[in-house]
Amino acid sequence: MAFVRFMKTIAPRYPELVILGDLFDYWIGDDAHPEAQPVIALLKLHAATGRRVIVMPGNRDVMLGAAFARAAGAELIRDPIVADICGRKTLLAHGDQWCLRDVAYQKFRALTHDPRWQAMMLMKSVEERLAIAKQARAQSESEKGEKSMADMDVVESAVAEAVKAAGVDLVIHGHTHKPAAHMQNGYERWVIPDWELDGPDGTAKSGAITFLEGARPQIQMF
């Protein structure tokens, strides 16, 4: 698994680890994921060395909560947020809020981010929540074939507005899983890759964006 390899090889080189969502394929509540314990244990072990573990929920794991954070030794942050990255003000986001061409997705996103909807979901049994999550994932995968790549990508003008409002010249996001560095008019937009780009031969193919003091960010593929 690419994430495990990353945690054992690249992450220990840096004092902070920031995950911008979609660490898990789905998350139906902190009480319902025993299969996630190996990943949580890796994060906890990383945090125990004195390094910071910072997690922003994504669209797949929007319901990550306080119990997860305690178990993983992590800090949960809101989306979006301005952070100081090696002395540079940076806008961090999952990125799906800027995929405005996909109107149906934006309606679904608004629903899943509603605290009332989340509270209602948590009142259901684990089995009911799991069935709902699997149905949503299946529908999402089915609809991908009906949408163009442009429809599923960010709207650059929306990103530009967010960058201007935040007063930054650098934005880092995920969601689209199209790792690249975009040099726009007046700002840089860096896109992180998916964790699950493992090749058919089992070779982990993923990456991360890394920072060093005084240097430009870099996309490290591994």
PLM regions: where:
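Core catalytic region of metal-dependent phosphoesterases/phosphodiesterases
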Residues: 1-85
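Conserved beta-sheet core of the metallophosphoesterase superfamily
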Residues: 71-78, 89-91, 96, 101-108, ...
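Charged/polar, solvent-exposed surface patches and flexible loops
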Residues: 5, 41, 45, 66, ...
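Short low-complexity stretches enriched in small and charged residues
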Residues: 9-12, 44-52, 94, 125-129, ...
